[in-house]
């Protein structure tokens, strides 16, 4: 009976709350180290869960200088100069993951293993390139082998290289020489325009140019397809228009409208045609007249 009462008394006792691990490690068995995710410590004791005590973290690791890039917004690289992680709160609290010196998260600080071999066990709190890029830290090659060039830059560069390779393959398949797409130079005036254009344009440029040249070729061979109409005058009409223009002073004014209308009916020319002829010959025939 005493033994049963003792069991009932033990069942009524309240279990103590489990401390919150600052390193987000999995629950460990007694006698195992905390930094290695279930790997025994060299000393044989019970280790903490990757906390930030004494140099920035337990479990056989220390967190040194801060690597957070504070100039990532302007495309530069600048660190705050914090030399070592110092936890802002007690072990097990959320503040234990924030540095009291620089205010950055512990993951921004360089992790240094304290194991004798120099290679510590893999911890869940190890800094990954994705976490660094998400928090705005610029990867730098001199701090840790985890850091790489930003993924966006590599993707853009690879996209340009792939596009250039595709263009070169298309040019080779079409039988065109692989030459850079460029406009002909205007400094070489001695060469023929066709010679300059033949070796410097690709298939994507030649197609539209051929279409433009075929569409613009008209009956007269000029730039526009529509032929310009030019009025031809007889010598008698020219003589009469010259005499009439000299009488008006090579200017058509409002009070001369009646005379101009009568003259156009006699010579069989339109008013705007007479006006254009006077404008074109004002400085040639007008100056020759005495």
Curated annotation (Swiss-Prot):
Q: For this UniProt entry, what is the primary localization, expressed as one broad class?
A: nucleus
Q: Known Gene3D superfamilies for this protein?
A: Homeodomain-like (1.10.10.60)
Q: Which residues bind DNA?
A: 226-289
**GO terms for biological process?**
regulation of developmental process
Cross-referenced InterPro entries: Homeodomain-like_sf, Homeodomain_ZF_HD, ZF_HD_homeobox_Cys/His_dimer
The biased composition feature labelled Acidic residues covers: 1-15
- Cell compartment(s), UniProt: Nucleus
Question: Which controlled-vocabulary keywords does the entry list?
Answer: DNA-binding, Homeobox, Metal-binding, Nucleus, Transcription, Transcription regulation, Zinc, Zinc-finger
A GO CC term attached to the entry? nucleus
Transmembrane stretches in the record are none
Q: Describe the task this protein carries out.
A: Putative transcription factor.
Quaternary structure, per UniProt, is: Homo- and heterodimer with other ZFHD proteins.
Domain remark from Swiss-Prot or TrEMBL: The homeodomain differs form the typical one by having namely 4 instead of 3 extra amino acids inserted in the loop between helix 1 and helix 2.
Stated name of the protein? Zinc-finger homeodomain protein 2
Protein source organism: Oryza sativa subsp. indica
